[in-house]
Amino acid sequence: MAPIPVVRAAIRRLRAHPPPPAQRIAIVHGDYRSGNMMHDGAGRMLAMFDWEMAHLGDPLEDLGWALDPIWDHFQPGIACGMLPRDEALAVWRAHSGLDVDPVAMRWWALFNSVKGRAIWTSAYREFIDGGRTDPVLAFSGWYLPRRQDAIIAAQLEGLA
């Protein structure tokens, strides 16, 4: 697979303009989104799944991943298909006790878009190499990269 110009531009941007220091270091899930949560139907989260990317870092990384437009379920501005973005940010602020620095959020949003693009590409590679036959992996290589590339381009345009 060939290098992707929009991803290369994003990586250059991330390297040239690192985020401000984290307000605090915390456990970062790495794939924090509604698809990895179990809840009771009344708004209480019961469990969080899929911890293979967990590490210590800036909690804004998880927030940026959860707010990536790739998870909006075709409802622009709706975080993870659940809440309006502003409401999701207010809930996060209230429960984390942290501010959401707009400069840091833009960095983490772009970082997570690049991370997502890498995930979709590697999942598709597993499918085309014949290692796995799950059709979700084929979808990962067909639709998600195109959408993520458009998201990255829009993010870069907003940073210019």
Where are these regions (language model features)?
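Regulatory N- and C-terminal appendages and interdomain linkers associated
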Residues: 126-160
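Active-site activation/catalytic loop segments of kinase-like enzymes and analogous catalytic loops
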Residues: 60-97, 111-130
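All-alpha amphipathic helical-bundle segments outside canonical DNA-binding/catalytic cores
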Residues: 99-111
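Hydrophobic residue at the +6 position relative to the catalytic HRD Asp in the kinase catalytic loop
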Residues: 35-39
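Conserved active-site segments centered on acidic
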Residues: 45
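An alpha-helical support segment within catalytic cores of ATP-dependent transferases
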Residues: 1-30, 40-41, 97
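Activation of the activation-loop gatekeeper triad in protein kinase-fold domains
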Residues: 49-54
